[in-house]
Amino acid sequence: MSIFFIHTMKKTAILVDGAFFLRRYRNIIKDTSPDPVKTANALWTMCMLHLYKEKNEKFNLYRIFYYDCLPYDKKQHNPLTGKAIDFSKTETHQFQVALFEELRKKRKVALRLGILEDGNKWIIKPEKTKALLKGNITVKDLTENDIQFDFKQKMVDMKIGIDIASIALKKQVDQIILIAGDSDFVPAAKLARREGVDFLLDPMWNPIKPNLFEHIDGLYSTLKYKTRK
């Protein structure tokens, strides 16, 4: 009598906190001139490596969800110099728009965009704030590059949490991989694990708090470090 074993490939959803990914990616590869094409390709490769990290088990990609905000595109005046700044013309804005376009071209990538809220204020950069508090510099020593306009992401964490819950409750995947670095995901991760989903965290080599280990099923980073020449 012949016995046939039917192997069903498990499905994986990969959720990416875009702001976290970009911050860690630039730190890891030591790239001072961001390229949207290279960045999109690096993210794609990083995600694909997760599907094949187990020698005896391969996963089928359900979808990559990329969470971020549309870049700020209004005009503001620097309070130190009075200089007008058109944020739609900045390198950051142009990079973000180009990166989103590249990601839209990738197979099975879905953009989930929140809102970048205008804080309506300028803040002194942290390193300069420390210098001021220590008395190493005075306010008169500040330059226009020492302050930055205050932006706050809205709805990104909420979208990540809702998607984790929805995917888990609908039994759409067997595994969820979250590329992120904070603990805001813990309630959603708990729900996913209770629903039988294998929940992995990729912090891109960033240290995580010890208590987070009890809320995940594994920790794994795939992006390779590049040393500065």
Each language-model region and where it sits:
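Domain-level signal for Mg2+-assisted phosphodiester chemistry and nucleotide/NA-binding surfaces
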Residues: 2-131, 144-149, 198
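Nuclease catalytic cores that cleave nucleic-acid phosphodiester bonds
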Residues: 113-229
